[in-house]
Amino acid sequence: MKYELKANQGIPASLLVMLSIATGLSVANCYYNQPLLGSMAADFKVNDLSANAVATLTQVGYMLGLLFIIPLGDLLSRRKLILTNYVLAACSLLAIGMARDIRIVWVASLITGATSVMPQFFIPLVSYHSAPSHKTRNVGIMQSCLLVGILGSRILSGLIANAWGWRMVYFIAAGLMTYCWLMMYKVLPALPAQAKETYGRLMKSLWHILRKYPYLRIASARAALAYGAFFALWSCLAFKMKQAPFLPEMIS
């Protein structure tokens, strides 16, 4: 059943729940790899730097998706963009799970990151259509699920990899993206394009916005530094935890 949504008229609780779930599962794609880097290095017989490129390229892909795919939501049907991204994300995750060459993992990780930007469609959608009295609550729910996906994905991938190997993490993730596609296919309305400008002009407008609002520049710089520090910790932690004195036999 496809929901009919109008600006500021409220969003059904069932749709909010589904969008929240999809938000957490989508962003998780960018973070499954961080606890798995040591296992990947051993499996592909590459050094730590080559394995760490998997995490780096995933984040580079996510940045490119935010920069170049999200603006397309003003020019094209967001429903079609979201569904297309889910298909591409599922395929790239499956490719990582089946890869026998680290270079395939690099390319697929870049695509995974770029196509896992669905939360940045969902959160504005919820804000735009929620009733004024519920906007902050609903956006808070969506942001909470985003953070649960970011943090919980690392725990989940570590547990799955410990039980069935790191490749199983990506097979399950591909299945979850297929599930999200089916869920969004059934419930998302058309969400037609809202702008009539060209893609080039839309991209130029991003630069004008950045120049016009100094607080945006400050907030962006702070977020970049905080996120960089956070990523630096997690991307290196997997390698350290596979060395003494953190080995299971030494801890026990």
Predicted regions and their residues:
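Extracytoplasmic
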Residues: 18-48, 119, 233-238
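Residue-level signature of mid-helix packing/kink "hotspots" within the transmembrane helices
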Residues: 31, 59-67, 117, 150-151
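Paired small-residue
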Residues: 92, 103-111
